[in-house]
Regions:
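Hydrophobic alpha-helical transmembrane segments in multi-pass integral membrane proteins
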Residues: 54-116
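Short aromatic-rich membrane-water interface segments that cap or initiate transmembrane helices
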Residues: 58-70, 129-144, 196-209, 372, ...
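Extracytoplasmic catalytic-loop and juxtamembrane helix elements of membrane-embedded
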Residues: 56, 129, 188-202, 304-327, ...
């Protein structure tokens, strides 16, 4: 092959000789690197914990290390995607337009990215909008990394490779679950290594850990439903129970709700695909119900003091307050209602291009010491304007409709990923985007929009 490549005089000749397999293999490796980033951060925590530097130095080193690793993998992905797309353009100019016509969500996501560029240029603080804040690292630069992750995941067309990625993701999430539990139970060595706060694992805040575990739980549900080998189903069931226990210890109720609604949808997807009764969804529901019941009865200890009973009481009380007087229910959702109201007030002031990424600190810090509205849909509308939100919704809606119509022909990994996307979207109603959670939304989104007609053997 190398001798043939030396003789090439045009890009078309180079891409003709290479074919698609080298690109798919490279994309697979890059997606795996993305998925392993939390494990890398975990190793960093252990290293600095063993070295024994003070807490401030340790936090700085770990946060900087995670961001540098993400930048490295993101930059490699971005360069690879540029090379890949150049080849696609040279080889299949007409097919690209046909692809967008058949799968319009690609156009919506591209339009959202381009709109983000305009919003950044028109921002009052272009530097912060481009680079993001020191804490969240979620500016335009990271948006391009997310886009690269999406394309890389989309390139991985092989079902077995997709399953490997899902399995690795679930395994890393199980590792995070173990650390959350050991942190909350007061293990001295773990608390010496992981000093971000209680129930945070390798992330910066316990809620962010909940967003991540939410995806791991639904991924395991899907892997269990579509697995034929008994020993693997047993492993997935145990891991699922363990992660459910961990997310209740973590006590991020919005993420728990994401897992609950995603469980319902992923079971609907399963029966719509197989078109016959199967007992496996009942096992998933039983595991979810029993672990939740244990928490409700006080058998899942958590230092937060917020078990299932407390969370449900709070949910019903907040819902009642909102229905009675939404303007006065400012404490609903642990104060999120105030942030939602303020975010909604900001949208009409800059409805077209928004304020730009990461431009809420001045507005929200006067109300509460935060810089996000704790709702990613409101966040998109404020940052990118109403068109930016519509592009985002357009991608989600068109993908859902298109894939729903062809569900029987979809690969199992596409349906697993669709459940993970739903889990993320539900939890995002109460949460924030972070540089270490958003990439996995776009990874699963790419898998959910996967190829049809390639049944597994």
């Amino acid at each position: 092959m190398f001798e043939e490549l030396k003789k090439c005089k045009t890009f078309k000749e180079i891409y003709t000789i290479l074919g698609t397999k080298p690109f798919e293999k490279a994309a697979f490796v890059l997606v795996l690197l993305w998925v392993l980033l939390p494990a890398w951060s975990c190793a960093e925590h252990f290293y600095w914990g063993i070295v024994g530097v003070n807490t401030m130095q340790k936090n700085y080193a770990v946060e900087a290390g995670y961001k540098i690793a993400m930048q490295l993998v993101g930059s490699l992905s971005l360069v690879f995607v540029c090379i890949y797309l150049l080849g696609r353009y040279v080889m299949n100019k007409g097919q690209i337009l046909q692809k967008i016509k058949n799968e319009p969500w690609h156009f919506c996501l591209l339009a959202m990215l381009l709109w983000s560029c305009i919003s950044t240029v028109l921002s009052d603080d272009i530097y912060t909008s481009f680079h993001g804040t020191d804490y969240r690292f979620d500016g335009l630069q990271s948006y391009f990394y997310y886009a690269a992750m999406y394309v890389c995941a989309f390139i991985v067309a092989n079902t077995k490779k997709n399953k490997v990625i899902c399995n690795v993701f679930a395994a890393v999430a199980t590792l995070a679950s173990l650390i959350v539990i050991l942190q909350d139970f007061g293990n001295p060595f773990i608390n010496q290594c992981f000093v971000g706060g209680p129930r945070t694992a390798m992330f910066f805040q316990f809620n962010h850990t909940g967003y991540y575990l939410n995806l791991g739980i639904v991924c395991l549900m899907g892997l269990y439903l579509y697995e034929k080998r008994l020993w693997l189903r047993f492993y997935y069931a145990l891991s699922l129970a363990f992660q459910l226990f961990a997310i209740l210890v973590n006590s991020t109720f919005g993420s728990y709700l994401g897992s609950f609604f995603a469980m319902i949808m992923i079971i609907i997807f399963f029966y719509r695909k197989v078109r016959k009764f199967d007992y496996k969804p009942l096992v998933v529901v039983a595991i979810f119900f029993l672990i939740s019941l244990a928490s409700y009865m006080g058998y899942v200890p958590t230092s937060s003091g917020q078990d299932m009973k407390v969370n449900l009481q709070t949910l019903f009380a907040d819902t009642s307050d909102i229905l009675e007087n939404p303007l006065e229910a400012t404490d609903a959702g642990h104060g999120r209602m105030t942030l939602w109201q303020q975010g909604l007030k900001m949208i009409p002031r800059r409805p077209i291009f928004g304020y730009g990424p990461e431009q809420l600190d001045k507005e929200l810090s006067e109300i509460m010491w935060v810089d996000r509205p704790d709702n990613e849909f409101i966040q998109h509308a404020v940052f990118l304007g109403i068109p930016g939100l519509l592009f985002y919704l357009g991608a989600l809606i068109t993908m859902f409709i298109r894939q729903w119509m062809h569900m029987r022909k979809l690969e199992s990994t596409a349906l697993i990923a669709a459940g993970c996307v739903i889990a993320y979207l539900v939890s995002s109603l109460f949460g924030n985007s972070m540089f270490y959670t958003v990439p996995y939304l776009y990874m699963f989104l790419a898998f959910a929009g996967g190829r049809r007609g390639e049944e597994e053997k």
